[in-house]
Regions:
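A short, well-ordered alpha-helix in the C-terminal region of glycosyltransferases
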Residues: 28, 165, 172, 179-194, ...
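Conserved acidic donor-binding segment of nucleotide-sugar-dependent glycosyltransferases
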Residues: 151-152, 156-163, 172-177
Length: 218
């Protein structure tokens, strides 16, 4: 009998300490006031990732509150079109289109929320990285995202077209710092427990050990 073993992606969870100096330098470089909330998009700027949906979300949320900075970090085929579209948004002064930032740790650390509006996904590293920093994720319920995020426990899942729902949830979370912190702590705990590189290594070695044991017994 053939057996398939699934092993989760793992990330380094040892670099989750807040870089206070780095945060302030980053905010200064990109003109982000300390009294602003921050929601980020991190990933490729390509059609299947739906970065245009992030713009739609930003415009809707801006109608409700103007204290949010929207960060987009990444490169891709839609860069020029997105830059042009942002220039015509009411919230254009609140946008920061940064290009690729590597490592993106500092972006997660300054952000209150990460939004993943994709039409299709596997198990994206940006979600694991964001959660490891205690930054809650709002995401389309597609691909492997439901394998990482438990809705309303350590993140939030939505139908991919439900921008209104994402907007309402983001507004609620930004108004409830205690609940936002609770979700963030749950996120960080889940990554440490289930998605660390150490756990991935242990599980991989266990599979190899089992295979070697079976082969030695013929």
């Amino acid at each position: 009998n053939k057996k398939i073993v699934a092993i989760n992606n793992g990330i380094n969870v040892s670099n989750s300490d807040l870089d206070v100096v780095g945060v302030q330098d980053f905010k200064k470089e990109f003109c982000i006031p300390n009294n602003k909330k921050i929601i980020c998009y991190i990933g490729r700027l390509d059609p299947e990732k739906r970065p245009d949906r992030f713009l739609e979300f930003a415009e809707k949320l801006f109608l409700v509150r103007e204290d949010v900075i929207f960060i987009m970090a990444g490169n891709g085929s839609m860069w020029a079109a997105l830059k042009e579209k942002i220039c015509h948004l009411k919230c254009r002064d609140n946008f920061r289109l940064l290009g690729e930032i590597y490592p993106a740790t500092i972006v997660y650390q300054i952000s209150d929320l990460l939004y993943i509006p994709s039409d299709t996904e596997g198990i994206p590293m940006c979600v694991l990285e964001s959660m490891s920093q205690g930054t809650p994720v709002l995401a389309s319920n597609v691909g492997g995202l439901s394998e990482i995020i438990e809705h309303r426990v350590d993140g939030f899942l939505f139908e991919k077209e439900d921008v209104e729902g994402v907007c309402a949830c983001a507004n609620f979370l930004l108004n409830d710092s205690e609940y936002l912190k609770y979700i963030g702590e749950n996120s960080k705990s889940k990554i440490r427990k289930h998605f660390s590189v150490q756990k991935m290594f242990v599980e991989t070695m266990r599979v190899y050990d089992e295979l070697l044991e079976k082969s030695s017994h013929g």
